[in-house]
Amino acid sequence: MIFHLQEEITEGHEVYKAWFEAEAIPQIEAAGGGCLGCGVDAENENILHLVMETPSMDVVEAFMGSEDFTKARQSAGVLVETTQITVLKQ
């Protein structure tokens, strides 16, 4: 399953990316997923875009429902209340 995730970040892309690559990616890969693309909006660098692949929506829901993962995202500057997920049809 491929999905697009958009959310606002407050600490800058480099801070987010450092956390994402060091902590989030290993967890996502361990769950059978991966990141296909990561970047910020060209006109607003506070808007992060990710294109991710996971085996199922259950995996996404497990990460989004994890209190520890949510706290880590917040520490990396994510405003979790702004997260929007769009499942992409192949």
Language model segments and positions:
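A common structural junction motif
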Residues: 27, 68-74
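Short S/T/G/P-rich N-terminal loop/turn motif that feeds into the first structured element of a domain
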Residues: 1-65, 82-90
